[in-house]
Amino acid sequence: MSNVLDLVDQTFFRLEQAAGVGQCVWVYNRPVDIDGLRRFHQHLQHGRLARRIERSALPFGRHRWVAPRDQRELEIATPRPREEFDAWLGEQANIRLDAEHGPGWHLATLPFTDGGAGVSFVVTHCLTDGVGGCLALVEAACGYDHTINLPAAGSRPRWRALREDARQTARDIPGIRRALVAAAAAARSARRHHGSASNPAPAPIAGADELVTLPAAAFFLDADEWDARAQSLGGTSNTLLAGLAARLAQRVGRVGVDGSVALAIPVNERTADDTRANAVTMVDITVDPAPATTDLREIRAATKRALIRHREVPDERQTLLPLIPLVPQRMIKRMVGVATGGATNVVVSSNIGAAPPAVNRPDGTDADHVALLSRYPDLTKTMTRQLGGLMVVHSACVERQVFVSILAYQPGRLTSNDELQQHVSRVLSDFSLTATMGWPCSEPVGGGAVGDPTI
């Protein structure tokens, strides 16, 4: 089995901080079994995430997967009140992860001084996507070591590395030629559509570029209520999530000039024994968010048409990927949209679906709540201006409980957790859904008019 990186994975690696991280969060309303959590951690160390990236010996070559030299220990944090859990999760998301030098992931637990505990698992997107991460967690929870036979880092003599990487580049030449033809055609098409005028570049930000703290929220719903609401609106779980995402985007102004919302829906393409880190492609649809609260049939139809088109027509973005190893790093930074959906003003709506129950058992027993969040801890003001903001919505169903997590930032419209929670509460009310917001899970929101005590 080849250890050469897939071109999508090489793209994420070259995007560096814009690639982002995934964070899986568990909450226990009782103490965590530390011994069980240590076993979980040990199996992760011998699972599908036990690898790192070694750069090619050629400046334009394909990188390779190698075995890690060492791995970080389980972190047991100093106890804090549960109300500080969100702040701690943000600190965990900010831990420096490095797919090349390690660590590529980190597991930690926070005991609550007022009872219970939380667990955080963060992993760089360079190592896995959501489905791959879910598989790694399930395998570790079940005590399964998914050992990948990889060479040690630095094990190839330089002459051998140069020879092997040159041969790989030679094998890639036909794809590079096709990509050059496609890139030229795309450039001609852009000139025809936009004429000689070009969009003005964003004004540079004065002084040093600054990091942006992205608002995040998570809420939980009963799976039967979620499914019933989707069915009553003529949709599915996928289209209900897309409808929620579209309405939230509408509320914060993340829309096109005609008021439409551009949704990017990840499609899982992972196969058995797939070694790719990111085995997904994006399906793009444009929807009118206005009728979503009463009728999801148009979103459902648009999704179906897009999936058919995806199977029949090659994705232009995939065709261009063979050029990635050849592109200078200064130009790679302009491709930040690849990691967040592929277009400006896009909204990513990702539904993993029904996850195996074992994903909720990091210490060997069921947690009370589990959720997956996207994080971009190193996103800067320049990047957010380039993207026009950011919105990523995730969902899955675990043991008849649906979680929805949101990471969103809209310059001038949505810049804080409080603002995001207010928008989420109103959107849930629009859909007549009752949800439990946040990790304490004590006060339901939605399902009534704003200000109603039943919210």
For the regions a protein language model found, what residue spans apply to each?
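Short beta-strand elements
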Residues: M282-I285, V392-C397
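Long, low-complexity, intrinsically disordered segments
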Residues: V445-I455
